[in-house]
């Protein structure tokens, strides 16, 4: 097993925490963005921000 310095371990921990933060707070907005980019299925009304907020 590779021995890492204390500084390297701290940097890796910060990197993983940053990755977790990005995944937790970025997943839903990414899905919403991709849904808007693709558009509605044929025969369905176009999605709007208001329709997302009010169902």
UniProtKB/Swiss-Prot annotation:
Mitochondrial intermembrane face residues: 37-55
Localization per record: Mitochondrion outer membrane
Superkingdom, natural source: Eukaryota
Transmembrane segments: 21-36
Assigned keywords, A-Z: Membrane, Mitochondrion, Mitochondrion outer membrane, Protein transport, Transmembrane, Transmembrane helix, Transport
Intervals, Cytoplasmic compartment: 1-20
UniProt entry tagged with the keyword Glycoprotein: no
Mitochondrion among keywords: yes
A GO term from the CC aspect: mitochondrial outer membrane translocase complex
Subunit structure, interactors included: Forms part of the preprotein translocase complex of the outer mitochondrial membrane (TOM complex) which consists of at least 7 different proteins (TOMM5, TOMM6, TOMM7, TOMM20, TOMM22, TOMM40 and TOMM70).
Protein name: Mitochondrial import receptor subunit TOM7 homolog
Gene source species: Sus scrofa
């Amino acid at each position: 097993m590779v021995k890492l310095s204390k500084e390297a371990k701290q940097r890796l921990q910060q990197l993983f925490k940053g990755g977790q933060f990005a995944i937790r707070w970025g997943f839903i907005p990414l899905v919403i963005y991709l849904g808007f980019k693709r558009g509605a299925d044929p025969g369905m009304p176009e999605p709007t921000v208001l329709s997302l907020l009010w169902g």
